[in-house]
């Protein structure tokens, strides 16, 4: 084995020289230079400074402006709530541990940090699944003139939390476990060992199939169907240009969210899958640290995409920031998310 396994950790460093110590008790400076740990801390500080204000503002602006409280926006707000969970439950913890060079909060703190990081990532993934299904049902109309209403949105939000908890909670109950990963300053699912005592192998397979592969298949199917439908409707000019433009812009926004999610999380999932399927292989701590910390940036991009691509929300946010007066105010057109639940784009 090219790593060192302990009762509740796995350090990607051979202990032939006797230098490996528990990541819960000693600095891990044999894995990387102190300045590299400082860089991780600085990165986490940046995510906190950017992630908290932008996600909190997303929630606050929606509460302040009644016209933003639409069914589709419930799902988007769900992403902001999940991101705030990651900021408070994960990023602040990792910032502190990176400054110390090891996971100072012990196994219990590792469970908390790993749980919030996994929960936030899974809520984001399943929210994108719900958004993809909503776009498919509204635009492609497989169920005739289905209207995506408030009750559907609430059920969608509840569904994302149930599925996210079905992934994040089992390691706390003894099916798999959370352990420090990479440079041992943040925690995640144990992809490094089979650990038969906690049936780790079966959980990792379950997680990759149910909580990654299936959601990706659903998302790609929905958007594949949606692209064909929008092209057909545009070619046949079956609906007004205004309606088609509104649907296209909302769909474009959600697709960009999916692409951003893939950019952030696929490297982490790929590395985790490689480590799991190549037990005992030789890899350094940076190999898992970089994709893990890159995935954490997901807490920033969703609200940024939403603000940049939604004129109505952007105007409301500027109005809130500027104390009731928007210096860049424009006449609000029909291209707003608040209108999309009444889509009239015809199916192919």
UniProtKB/Swiss-Prot annotation:
It is found in: Membrane; Cell projection, Cilium, Photoreceptor outer segment. A lipid is attached at residues 322-323 (S-palmitoyl cysteine). Keywords: Acetylation, Cell projection, Chromophore, Disulfide bond, G-protein coupled receptor, Glycoprotein, Lipoprotein, Membrane, Metal-binding, Palmitate, Phosphoprotein, Photoreceptor protein, Receptor, Retinal protein, Sensory transduction, Transducer, Transmembrane, Transmembrane helix, Vision, Zinc. SUPFAM superfamilies: Family A G protein-coupled receptor-like. The modification Phosphothreonine is found at residues 335-336, 340, 342. Zn(2+) binds at residues 201, 279. The record marks 113 as: Plays an important role in the conformation switch to the active conformation. Residues 330-348 are annotated as: Interaction with SAG. Phosphorylated on some or all of the serine and threonine residues present in the C-terminal region. Contains one covalently linked retinal chromophore. Upon light absorption, the covalently bound 11-cis-retinal is converted to all-trans-retinal. After hydrolysis of the Schiff base and release of the covalently bound all-trans-retinal, active rhodopsin is regenerated by binding of a fresh molecule of 11-cis-retinal. The chain crosses the membrane at residues 37-61, 74-96, 111-133, 153-173, 203-224, 253-274, 287-308. Residues 1-36, 97-110, 174-202, 275-286 are extracellular. The keyword RNA-binding does not apply. This is Rhodopsin. It comes from Trichechus manatus (Caribbean manatee). The lineage of its organism: Eukaryota, Metazoa, Chordata, Craniata, Vertebrata.
